[in-house]
A protein has these predicted regions:
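Membrane-interfacial helix-loop-helix junctions in multi-pass membrane proteins
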Residues: 30, 202-255
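Short helix-capping/hinge motifs at transmembrane helix termini and TM-loop junctions
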Residues: 52-61, 89, 143-151, 180-182, ...
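Transmembrane helix segments
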Residues: 54, 58-60, 177-223, 227
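Hydrophobic alpha-helical transmembrane segments of multi-pass membrane transport proteins
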Residues: 47-52, 71-146, 192, 197-198
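Membrane-interface helix starts
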Residues: 25-47, 241-247
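Alpha-helical transmembrane segments and their short interhelical loops
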Residues: 117-191, 240-263
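Junction motif at the cytosolic side of a transmembrane helix
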Residues: 4, 237, 247-280
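Short, membrane-interfacial amphipathic segments enriched in basic
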Residues: 2-25, 169, 213-227
Length: 280
């Protein structure tokens, strides 16, 4: 028997559950202590909803497209995209904290525990997704006063879609963080990923309008995983299922997560930190 099976053989399901609970609790406490992170997570989509939507309401009229059964206001259309945007930014913020923990040596301490790496990273991913769910539902509560009122069942039906999209976007952030060597470089890389994904999607405008203006950009949007996260959320809010988007989100989530687990190096960043300390 190899060393790896011997290392994990004595761990029970209860011990795995305790480990998961501890990681989720730690991430929850970190989020509560970073109140400005919670405020900024809400301010960003609210600015788009109250200002951007008001300015473009008359310019970008929305025709009857699935899952909608009638004409809708522009702010109603962009609401699912803003929910996905909250999850996208939260996934990148969670990955930023992982880069910080790695540079400080905290992740190395965590990953030398008897639990397998895939479980520890998956637990971090689940914790980040739960935080994003809190942000999303607070935003939905505020948006309700702005006459964004999906069917009551939609608030429950959208939960699985939010979990899947949150896991996919969090796994993407984790994969990116595994390739970033230093904390200082992550902000630039994060912006390079976030804004192209957000704007080259169906979050702000229907894809049929993009196709009319630029067929090439339309195909880019179709290949964008964020587009399918938005559409999965959009359909689920109205009690419907977009099978293609579900398949793409699940497939990308698996690919991103496997890539992050294989590429993650808990020691990366430590030599640079030691070098800076020696210079001081």
């Amino acid at each position: 028997m190899s060393a790896a099976p011997l290392r994990f053989a004595h761990l029970s399901i209860a011990q795995y559950a305790i480990c998961l609970k501890g990681i989720v609790w730690r991430e929850g406490l970190r989020f509560l202590h970073q109140r400005e992170r919670f405020v900024s997570a809400l301010v960003r989509p609210l600015v788009w909803l109250f200002i951007f939507a008001a300015g473009f309401r008359q310019v970008l009229g929305i025709s009857i497209i699935p899952p909608y059964e009638t004409y809708i206001l522009y702010e109603v259309y962009i609401a699912p995209g803003l929910l996905a945007m909250i999850q996208l930014f939260n996934g990148m913020q969670s990955s930023l904290s992982m880069v910080y923990d790695r540079e400080m040596g905290n992740m190395r301490t965590l990953l030398v525990s008897p639990f397998p790496r895939w479980f520890l990273l998956s637990s971090k991913l689940i914790a980040g997704t739960l935080v994003s769910l809190l942000q999303v539902y607070v935003f939905l509560a505020i948006a309700w006063f702005w006459e964004i009122e999906p069917p009551p069942i939609g608030y429950i039906a959208v939960l699985p879609a939010l979990i899947l999209s949150g896991l996919m976007l969090g796994a993407l952030g984790m994969l990116i963080s595994s390739a970033v060597k230093q904390l200082e470089n992550f902000a630039g890389v994060m912006n390079f990923v976030i804004f192209p994904m957000f704007f080259a999607s169906s979050a702000l405008y229907p894809l049929w309008r993009v196709q009319e203006a630029s067929p090439a950009l339309y195909y880019v949007c179709q290949l964008n995983p964020f587009t399918h996260a938005v559409e999965l959320i959009r359909f689920a809010l109205y009690g419907k299922l977009n099978v293609l988007s579900l398949a793409v989100v699940c497939g990308c989530m698996a690919v991103f997560m496997i890539g992050a687990i294989l590429a993650y190096d808990p020691a990366r960043g430590l030599p640079a930190r030691r070098g800076r300390a020696a210079e001081d």
